């Protein structure tokens, strides 16, 4: 498929021809490989298993049961067809009132009932992808900068930058401190941006973190709220994994911090939340994204922009009924947390048998897997990509390399465990264990060689190497974004 003429770019816009969509990365290449050879237990048992999709399929049976028991919630049933004419007509772009009320109520429940949300501040969007872009259009102009702790969600370059012209500066976080974000690190990145004459408009967090599966504690979140208030920059918190916590305490929303912190220490007009039902409810196909802002002007602007990415009225109607069913919601959230905890334990126990460790986590639909000991060169991103190719081509697993998430240390991989049935997970774990077992001698020899190299390096040389890695990472960030192309309908480029 192509356009006539030799100079195809001449008839297209700058957005259509720029290199900022982000499709040409290993994160998306893994999806393309999977699309060509998808695993199936019986039809294609030697195919690639999809472990690059952060999708929550563990409780779809509960939703199916609710739909069967509540046929009146849909206009596509005999019990609900009487609502068809009303729902089929144009609706308020702000959304059905009962839908916004139900969403606000559910957001409170997903955060343990410790905070309430105002339905009038709920703005709809087509998934979290649309919500993230909408908030960027509301807050920033082309060339403005947002700081984001790295590693961060691989598709943020698309969601936040591609059409808005906003720039991202990573806030590097280290494995030596379990990739924890500190105010000092944010301050460092802020100063670096200023030294480059960049206008910093805000800080973006994912909490719980994608890809780490960790949560920010209340003290850290409070200090970051104070930080953005001092700098007079925005704080956008992506909380789409709020209800995926399965251990280690309660999730703390930035809304809870706003309620508890002294009013003199926070400018609430700077605080914004992105949410969706894709992860917590396992409904990415419903395309329900939410912008929730404490700033009246942002709410007003986002409402106007929502006309470009509405949630269908039919979807709103059914979800308004489902999310208003307190008994169902309470049971769903409890059971989802329980099943995620079991699945996480099964996965981490399975890879531990292969002498593979993960970052300690308690939320999300994935694990941050440490494969540094399998690298040919532990200081090389090239070695990381070599290993990734082996995992894709030989082990037949689509996992995502850390460099796709702008991690500054080679050898970390995100691997998703909630998007498959138990039998498929068993096959995936078997493949991992078999691969490590067959290559164990090579791994031991490689580790010995790496240890000797490290011992021979001075502290000064190590410091230089770490700095050089960050510079290499920056070049990777600037050069590794590709022009858009024609995408598979199953591509994550089209998903939240």
UniProtKB/Swiss-Prot annotation:
Key words, A-Z? Ethylene biosynthesis, Fruit ripening, Lyase, Phosphoprotein, Pyridoxal phosphate, S-adenosyl-L-methionine
Name positions with the PTM Phosphoserine.
483, 488, 491
Q: Which residues bind substrate?
A: 55, 93
- Which residues does the record list as N6-(pyridoxal phosphate)lysine (modified residue)? 279
Changes after translation:
Phosphorylated on serine residue by MAP kinase (MPK6).
Q: What EC class is this?
A: lyase
Enzyme Commission designation:
4.4.1.14
Needed co-factor(s) = pyridoxal 5'-phosphate
Which SUPFAM superfamilies does this chain map to? Answer: PLP-dependent transferases
Q: How does activity depend on pH?
A: Optimum pH is 8.2.
What induces it, per record? By ethylene. By indole-3-acetic acid (IAA) and cycloheximide (CHX).
Its GO biological process annotations read: ethylene biosynthetic process; fruit ripening
Annotated CDD domains: AAT_like
Keyword check for Phosphoprotein: yes
Report the pathway entry.
Alkene biosynthesis; ethylene biosynthesis via S-adenosyl-L-methionine; ethylene from S-adenosyl-L-methionine: step 1/2
The reaction(s) catalysed by this protein are: S-adenosyl-L-methionine = 1-aminocyclopropane-1-carboxylate + S-methyl-5'-thioadenosine + H(+)
Tell me which InterPro entries the record gives: Aminotransferase_I/II_large, Ethylene_sulfur-biosynth, NHTrfase_class1_PyrdxlP-BS, PyrdxlP-dep_Trfase, PyrdxlP-dep_Trfase_major, PyrdxlP-dep_Trfase_small
Q: Which is one GO molecular function term here? A: pyridoxal phosphate binding
Tell me which tissues or organs this protein is expressed in.
High in developing leaves and in flowers. Expressed in roots and siliques.
| Subunit structure comment from the entry | Homodimer and heterodimer. In vivo, the relevance of heterodimerization with other ACS enzymes is however unsure. Interacts with GRF3.
Query: What family does this chain come from, according to its entry?
Result: Belongs to the class-I pyridoxal-phosphate-dependent aminotransferase family.
Instruction: Give the protein's biological function.
Output: 1-aminocyclopropane-1-carboxylate synthase (ACS) enzymes catalyze the conversion of S-adenosyl-L-methionine (SAM) into 1-aminocyclopropane-1-carboxylate (ACC), a direct precursor of ethylene.
Q: Any additional notes? A: The stability of ACS proteins, and the regulation of such stability, play a central role in ethylene biosynthesis.
Name the chain's protein. 1-aminocyclopropane-1-carboxylate synthase 2
- Native species of this protein? Arabidopsis thaliana (Mouse-ear cress)
Source taxonomy:
Eukaryota, Viridiplantae, Streptophyta, Embryophyta, Tracheophyta
